[in-house]
A protein has these predicted regions:
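Classical eukaryotic N-terminal signal peptides for Sec-dependent ER targeting/secretion
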Residues: 1-11
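N-terminal helix-rich structural modules
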Residues: 25-209, 645
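C-terminal, non-catalytic "cap/extension" segments appended to globular domains
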Residues: 25-45, 49, 210, 214, ...
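Intrinsically disordered or highly flexible coil/loop and linker segments, enriched in small
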Residues: 56, 60, 64-71, 86-99, ...
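Active-site-proximal, well-structured secondary-structure segments within enzyme catalytic domains
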Residues: 145, 149-151, 171, 179-185, ...
Length: 697
């Protein structure tokens, strides 16, 4: 049933989109020359002035709309676009709040973007502003893209609560939104600052068994080894640590980050979201959150995630049993003796199995991936695939000395063969990217792409930042290389989709949220491509290129664990969904109890007892709320989009250029279903996802 639901939703959307595509055209608004960059290196007074100026400018534009009725839809939208551009500093402030090393700067940045969010919420609850904006009713705009922007404007008013009957109710909606914003920020910042550690003597051979000597040496001070809950540390311990007690300890520390404070924060956020949904007439917050996504309803999301979980259940059990055999042998147990593969066991025994059954030596493999060669490989692959050129910039002020800066150009010096360009035909930059790639104290702990500025034709170039926690020195895991490709995909979507956009709302990664991950998930396949890896993966000691035999082993072994990983993703999706479908105000509601209940039904791992607090560090509950399902929904789309590349070649110029210009470059100017139809020529089949879930390529 899940495939039928997913197929019917996608087919319906794409069928509608085919008509809209003809009406709208597949190119963004024609470009005009863009203005210069702003420096990303700012201090507290500079940021505060910039933020105050943005609010002052936006307020003056809004006042002008209230004071004088726009002559038509296009004039209204131009004024609203000016407000959007002015408020764009909030995105940059949000980035700084997550990555800046100075606490005072992080606090100022937080204050800035919260103030901007609160201003925007008040604006879309302002009846006078709404009445000016809605005065045109069903009148047509000058073109299809302007019409789409106008429809989005009215939708934003509706979803903000403008239809509430009284000023008192609208004021209450404002207070709910403001409190959610503040609590979500507190949740995220608590995670960023909550780094936990484990220490032991450097000569504790039993505890440190299996860990790379170089890793141990790098973590030793005065005879004491200190391991943190930062991802590079925990990843290494889970994969190579022979001590189950060490793995369990690190898992417990990592999965308890944020607790107990974030447990109380989450409870309050869930209560506020429930109240928000009830206030606006939705049965629950999940219904509100999914209404503007491709999937359409929370019930469709529930059916989809349950179906994916069911189809992978048998394969996940088979994968787990293969690991149980290794653990039994490790523990000296008889064949068939009951034994569990705990969550902190999986990576260790999977690494052992891949070595034994697929001839994949993970330690050997990691020596072919260092940050610098991985970076050059990703840049080279992106340049070929998206027909771009990257130039390193030095001397550009940033928030930290480790941040790398690149300007982005069309490869041809014009627009790469794809039509109008903000380069203005002069070969100038079309955007800028920042790479903040290594762990440090109080920095965002995960991997993500952040907006610095959205591209707006004739106003500003797109700027984006990739934030990760990869090791600066020492080997990288192949999984980290895959993450590099994934997040760089978002960065390229932001830059390419920011070209020629008249309306800021449509710039960059601006499609429906459950399409957003698809381009990046597709790009993960390049991290397994032999031509791509052979172009940069060289041994850190000898400089020899990665052997084809090792690459073949990597590709064979990559299939193992897919079912378990997918079921775990569906567990996360169900936690995300169910926490927002259930009433958190009923007596006895407990988010941790809900997560435990769902773990029993969906997680491939047994319960870990009371020594972890997963929901306290499930950061997606803040940003994604009910829609974590989007990762697997996007995977279905990614696998469909990958098929033309498999037929023509991963770097086929025609296919890659069509993909760049038909899928990425429109940004949000067209519905995601239109982008799919324009590239594939038909509704995407779920057959590719089905094969992928079954372990095929």
């Amino acid at each position: 049933m899940w495939m039928a639901v997913a197929a019917s939703v996608i087919t319906f959307l794409v069928t509608l989109a085919a008509t809209e595509l003809v009406e709208a055209g597949s190119s963004p608004v024609a470009a005009t020359p863009a203005l210069t960059f702003e420096d990303a290196g700012v201090d507290v007074p500079t940021l505060s002035r910039r933020c105050d100026k943005a609010l002052e400018t936006a307020r003056s534009f809004a006042d002008a709309i209230r004071a004088t009725a726009p002559a038509g839809i296009d004039e209204l939208l131009t004024r609203v676009n000016d407000i959007d551009v002015a408020l764009g500093v909030g995105a940059f402030a949000s980035l700084l709040s997550e990555v800046h090393p100075d606490e005072k700067m992080r606090d100022a940045a937080t204050s800035c973007y919260l103030g901007i969010d609160q201003f925007a919420t008040r604006l879309y609850l302002d009846r006078a502003f709404y009445e000016r904006s809605a005065a045109f009713g069903t009148a047509a705009a000058a073109d299809r893209l302007a019409q789409r922007r106008y429809e989005k404007l009215l939708e934003d008013f509706e979803r903000s609560g403008i239809g509430l009957a009284t000023a008192e109710l609208r004021g209450h909606a404002q207070s709910i939104s403001d409190e959610i914003d503040e609590l979500s920020t507190n949740f995220s910042h608590k995670l960023a600052s909550d780094t936990r550690t484990f220490s032991c003597a450097a000569d504790d051979a039993d505890t440190l068994a299996g860990l790379d000597p170089a890793f141990v040496a790098a973590h030793t001070t005065d005879g004491v080894v200190t391991i943190t809950t930062d991802y590079p540390d925990t990843t290494h311990v889970y994969k190579y640590g022979r001590s189950a007690e060490l793995r369990r300890t690190m898992y417990g520390l990592s999965r308890s980050r944020g607790a107990p404070e974030n447990l109380a924060t989450l409870q309050r956020v869930l209560e506020l979201r429930w109240e928000w949904a009830q206030l606006l007439g939705w049965p629950h917050y999940a219904a509100y959150a999914t209404a503007t996504k491709m999937i359409g309803t929370a019930e469709h999301a529930d059916t989809f995630t349950r179906g994916v979980a069911n189809i992978t259940a048998a394969a996940a059990e088979e994968e787990t049993e293969r690991l149980r055999r290794l653990k039994r042998a490790d523990l000296g147990l008889a064949e068939g003796a009951p034994v569990d593969i705990e969550a902190y066991d999986w990576s260790y025994y999977a690494t052992q199995l891949r070595a034994r059954e697929y001839a994949l030596n993970a330690t050997e493999l990691s020596h072919y991936f260092r940050y610098e060669n991985a970076r050059e490989g990703v840049l080279r692959a992106a340049a070929r695939l998206f027909h771009l050129r990257f130039e390193r910039r030095t001397g550009v002020p940033t928030w930290h000395e480790a941040v790398e800066v690149y300007d982005v150009f069309w490869a041809s010096g014009g627009d790469g063969g794809g039509g109008d360009s903000d380069a203005g035909g002069g070969g100038g930059p079309i955007g800028r990217i920042y790479l903040d790639m290594h762990p440090r104290a109080d920095k965002y702990k995960h991997a993500a792409q952040f907006t610095v500025r959205d591209g707006v034709a004739g106003v500003q170039l797109p700027e984006g930042c990739l934030v990760t926690n990869f090791p600066l020195e020492g080997p990288m895991e192949h999984s980290q290389v895959t993450t590099f490709f994934h997040e760089f995909g978002h960065l390229m979507h932001h830059v390419v989709g920011g070209q020629g956009q008249r309306w800021k709302l449509f710039s960059g990664v601006a499609t429906e949220w459950d399409f957003v991950e698809a381009p990046s998930q597709m790009l993960e396949e390049w991290a397994l491509d032999e031509e791509t890896l052979r172009s940069f993966a060289t041994h850190d000691a000898t400089g020899a290129p990665i052997p084809r035999e090792l690459l073949a082993a990597l590709r064979r072994a990559a299939v193992f664990g897919r079912a378990v990983s997918t079921r775990q993703q569906m567990y996360y999706a169900q936690v995300s969904l169910q926490l927002h479908m259930r009433d958190p105000t009923v007596p006895g509601f407990d988010a941790e109890a809900v997560a435990a209940e769902l773990a029993a039904a969906f997680s491939p791992y047994p319960p870990v007892g009371g020594f972890t607090h997963f929901v306290a560090n499930f950061g997606h509950l803040m940003g994604y709320s009910a829609i974590y399902y989007t990762y697997m929904w996007s995977e279905a789309i990614a696998q469909a989009m990958l098929q033309p590349f498999k037929r023509a070649g991963f770097y086929d110029p025609s296919t890659s250029l069509r993909y760049r210009d038909l899928v990425l470059r429109p940004g949000g100017a067209l519905p995601a279903a239109s982008l799919l139809y324009s590239f594939l020529g038909e509704p995407p089949s779920l057959d590719a996802l089905h094969r992928w879930l079954r372990g095929g390529e």
